[in-house]
Amino acid sequence: MAEKGQKSLAVNKKARFDYLIEDTFEAGMVLVGTEVKSIRQGKINIKEGYARIENSEIYLHNVHISPYEQGNIFNKDPLRIRKLLLHKAEIRKLIGYVQQKGYTLVPMKVYLQNGLVKLQLGVGVGKKLHDKRQDMAKKDSQRRIQKELGQRQKGME
């Protein structure tokens, strides 16, 4: 899953559970030096995060980057709004998605790629409770089937 030169730092596992993700985009983040050091240590929480489009630019909200211990006066607000860097064509595509009813921009994962902090941004529709239950039931049945197949394989040997 991890490509060459890519190190995963934070993954939002809840995103695929809460949203039906239709498309993903890779975005850079505008960060301060102490934030980068803190992210490299894995001190970032993207579970509650979301992105918004303001003046044809995309901003990341509600993502917590813990202050760097040795950063003292250079540390910024942990929950500050951060700008995301995408190509204009990608931003236009995202604007088109978000203008449709119910679409949300969700941070999927944060990773290092060739020394740069990148964010995988997912475009999705929120799932209803019954959709989540169906997905859980489907996963449980798949696990049961795999378990049965594994036991049969062991019995034949």
Curated annotation (Swiss-Prot):
Record-given protein name: SsrA-binding protein
Role: Required for rescue of stalled ribosomes mediated by trans-translation. Binds to transfer-messenger RNA (tmRNA), required for stable association of tmRNA with ribosomes. tmRNA and SmpB together mimic tRNA shape, replacing the anticodon stem-loop with SmpB. tmRNA is encoded by the ssrA gene; the 2 termini fold to resemble tRNA(Ala) and it encodes a 'tag peptide', a short internal open reading frame. During trans-translation Ala-aminoacylated tmRNA acts like a tRNA, entering the A-site of stalled ribosomes, displacing the stalled mRNA.
Protein species of origin: Alkaliphilus metalliredigens (strain QYMF)
A single MF term (Gene Ontology): RNA binding
Gene Ontology biological-process entries: trans-translation
Keywords annotated in UniProt: Cytoplasm, RNA-binding
Family according to the record: Belongs to the SmpB family.
Chief location of this protein within or outside the cell: cytoplasm
Localization per record: Cytoplasm
Region (Disordered): 130-157
